Amino acid sequence: MNNSINHKFHHISRAEYQELLAVSRGDAVADYIIDNVSILDLINGGEISGPIVIKGRYIAGVGAEYADAPALQRIDARGATAVPGFIDAHLHIESSMMTPVTFETATLPRGLTTVICDPHEIVNVMGEAGFAWFARCAEQARQNQYLQVSSCVPALEGCDVNGASFTLEQMLAWRDHPQVTGLAEMMDYPGVISGQNALLDKLDAFRHLTLDGHCPGLGGKELNAYITAGIENCHESYQLEEGRRKLQLGMSLMIREGSAARNLNALAPLINEFNSPQCMLCTDDRNPWEIAHEGHIDALIRRLIEQHNVPLHVAYRVASWSTARHFGLNHLDLLAPGKQADIVLLSDARKVTVQQVLVKGEPIDAQTLQAEESARLAQSAPPYGNTIARQPVSASDFALQFTPGKRYRVIDVIHNELITHSHSSVYSENGFDRDDVCFIAVLERYGQRLAPACGLLGGFGLNEGALAATVSHDSHNIVVIGRSAEEMALAVYQVIQDGGGLCVVRNGQVQSHLPLPIAGLMSTDTAQSLAEQIDALKAAARECGPLPDEPFIQMAFLSLPVIPALKLTSQGLFDGEKFVFTTLEVTE
């Protein structure tokens, strides 16, 4: 659907049009007029003089000709620069560990007026009930929360145990929902390339909407074939030439800067005046601590401007206009007549200092959002209930037998990247030939009573203790890493007792833990409380060694088989390049 309007998302009644036209002509009173404001021109560069005239949800007019127009209320912007509301092109709200309601409270005052969300984390745990809850939240949100229908539940068939399926029939039931913009990331790219009919059926069913991609490092004929199938974008690019080639072949590029996957520095040099309509910004996975201390899409814009010298109008273009056009949300692309009045007023456009936010023509008050959060969450009817069908384990469950002189595969972590390397290490009577090797295990949590799948992990920086979590993409089984089997067992016990969550164990004791009662993924605490708890968890984790910046988010991707190179699922070690299971011992 790239760059074509979809009228499904821009419904305005004839009566609304008549009222809007009357205000545009100067024959009727506006609801709001924003005075003393300049509008950043995302098309030509430079600025447009205000004011901005608003009627209902929409902009009725822009420019000096409305200086004396009547309004019920006038907003003095005090010389601010106005830009369209920011849009996150791809994210999983669950990865913030906030509910959609809390996420809105945390991000809307920062100018994030629209999100394109794939709720496949909760769908992997709870199936269609999880998607239905996200749809309810989207329907009642002030923020424009659009949904892509999760396409790969589980991420890769036959490679892991997850909590539910999401069939094509169930997917089709949501296709025409007013908040649905398309099909979420098609992660099984080998299946698409090989022409598997079940995957092509999904693509065909959503072809009139937007088809999201997922193809880290893909190139050559395989990339050509993937694009031939109709995939329109990718958020997994992590190399400059990879991103350039995808743009050359007609893909739109989502430049991701999350809490674990940090690709902005690698890809930002690609952005220019010519290709910026095909470039977007996304976070994918960003935790509440970073949102509170650094920001969300606003933080990405700031870095484009300050660190990569991207011109103002181009930086704000890729943060709004490009994404709106890509998803057919043309009513959100500009501050212009007839567009939805999603407006961010900036006291400093270069520093992205947000002064005030309006959504659907109404000013946003952060304190009101916070005061209403609890009631709005209850109104959404969250799917509470314990999703951990797993008994505690003992240290003996993590026992691995090693033979001196033999070589064993090691999952090698790359800090702040989702990809891993597949290396090996030789075992001797004194241990492995590298001192950074620790243990990793994945335990299915959906009642199948499988023994833990165990492996070796290098490069994570864990010198002592253990970390455990039920946030483990995409099936969200229990993942635990540690230096001792006893501490690993204790960490697993704690997250089971919490009904899901995160835990740090050191010196034989639980140092910090965070319960996540909704699907083992999300908390019902406020954003501020969550940020404080995350801070405590990270502080406890740092005592275990020089870990990645976001150890729990990095750990969560160690079991995702659709990202190279070596991962561990509940079924065993998986080669993410050959897409086959492999053995711990290197025999070839």
From Swiss-Prot:
One record GO biological process: adenine catabolic process
Catalysed conversion reaction: adenine + H2O + H(+) = hypoxanthine + NH4(+)
Organism per entry: Shigella boydii serotype 4 (strain Sb227)
Pfam family name, one: Amidohydro_1
Required co-factors: Mn(2+)
The organism's place on the tree of life at top rank: Bacteria
Enzyme class: hydrolase
Name of protein: Adenine deaminase
EC number: 3.5.4.2
HAMAP family, alphabetized: Adenine_deamin
Assembly behavior: Homodimer.
Lineage: Bacteria, Pseudomonadati, Pseudomonadota, Gammaproteobacteria, Enterobacterales
GO molecular function: adenine deaminase activity
Keywords of this entry: Hydrolase, Manganese
InterPro entries hit by this protein: Adenine_deam, Adenine_deam_C, Amidohydro-rel, Metal-dep_hydrolase_composite, Metal_Hydrolase
Primary gene name: ade
Sequence similarity: Belongs to the metallo-dependent hydrolases superfamily. Adenine deaminase family.
Signal peptide annotation: none
Gene3D superfamilies in the record: Metal-dependent hydrolases, Urease, subunit C, domain 1
